[in-house]
Amino acid sequence: MKTAARLDRIPPYLFAEIDRRRDEAVARGVDIINMGIGDPDKPTPPVVLEAMHAAIDDPSTHNYPPYKGTKAYREAAAAWFERRFGVGGFHPDTEVISSIGSKEAIHNTFLAFVDPGDYTLIPDPAYPVYRTSTIFAGGEFFAMPLLPENQLLPDLEAVPETVARKAKLLWLNYPNNPTGAVASLEFFEKVVHFAKKHDILVCHDNAYSEMAYDGYKPPSILQVPGARDVAIEFLSCSKAYNMTGWRVGFVIGNRTGIAGLGQVKTNIDSGVFKAIQQAAIAAFGLDDERLHALMAVYQNRRNIIVEGLRSLGWPLEAPKATLYVWAPIPKSFGSSVEFVGALLDKCGIIVPPGNGYGEHGEGFFRIALTVPDERMREAIGRMEAAGIRFEG
């Protein structure tokens, strides 16, 4: 018995590998500080839990949900989007669809639009699912390097015309995982122009839209005039509402994009449990003060890590958004894998290597701000005690 040949092209999922290494270390008795995965350690807000409890007690939530989400959920998602980004008029029946978090919807979008021989334009480094989903769909991906000299934004002019003509999807993710980079509306305007020129669907993974610091508010690509002609945006309750395990979000924007995704979803999944949708509606109604309090926690953690690494010689700027700090490895290490292995072996610290996010992630590692302050300070202390410093 043999698995499909496509699996030979797909490496082990980065975060599953992190979990495996964590479990092995814990089994050896190592006190692990796991800063490998962006899984918030704070609880889901009480009002969301209360809505969930009430919905579970309602027998009408116990049967199959609508494939594209309940009407109430899609209306609430569209209303939240309008309040947050100032862009309204999205029809809940044709321009909004529920999703099982973001990962499922991202993967299914590739199945909806990519045929064998088609190209997808993928940032590098990036969330690994963009690359693997291209392979599952039978397409080819063209890596767009995110380079410091371009403010970690892809250079669309560097995409060869022969590739652009065959491209079906252009993927973006700002605020960016893993780099923490942000994008302006001016950049998104260039993206929309490029997509219209080449008849490409822009897929903006905006999972970190609410995870920003120092008063910064990340934009939506759909704020650009004409963007809904070529773009869809993926949003999730996971990070902003501490609901990673609940698996609920939505996709909004271009009708063809939503229809294609919906056609795949109706044949693959059976929607989101209606009680979870009710809970998410309650989350959409939370005021900004709760989010500000949450982000104050993450901002303090960001400062602990950035200042701690600076004290060990790292040349870092504090990221404006996301739950991550993206940092270079010391030159004394030959690769990012070697460096993160040393952190695990010498310090009991788990972080992912940059090359797990693509070729242009080599030479970097990512720190997730999802452990308590005291454990972050302890991590810096362990690195100092082990003699791990940055040497340019």
UniProtKB/Swiss-Prot annotation:
GO terms for biological process: lysine biosynthetic process via diaminopimelate, diaminopimelate-aminotransferase pathway. It is an enzyme of class 2 (transferase). GO terms for molecular function: L,L-diaminopimelate aminotransferase activity; pyridoxal phosphate binding. Homodimer. Its cofactor is pyridoxal 5'-phosphate. Disulfide bonds: none annotated. Its EC number is 2.6.1.83. HAMAP family: DapL_aminotrans_1 (MF_01642). This is LL-diaminopimelate aminotransferase. InterPro entries: Aminotransferase_I/II_large (IPR004839), DapL/ALD1 (IPR019942), LL-DAP_aminotransferase (IPR050881), NHTrfase_class1_PyrdxlP-BS (IPR004838), PyrdxlP-dep_Trfase (IPR015424), PyrdxlP-dep_Trfase_major (IPR015421), PyrdxlP-dep_Trfase_small (IPR015422). Belongs to the class-I pyridoxal-phosphate-dependent aminotransferase family. LL-diaminopimelate aminotransferase subfamily. Involved in the synthesis of meso-diaminopimelate (m-DAP or DL-DAP), required for both lysine and peptidoglycan biosynthesis. Catalyzes the direct conversion of tetrahydrodipicolinate to LL-diaminopimelate. Can also use m-DAP instead of LL-DAP as the amino-group donor. Substrate binds at residues 13, 38, 103, 127, 177, 366. Keywords: Aminotransferase, Pyridoxal phosphate, Transferase.
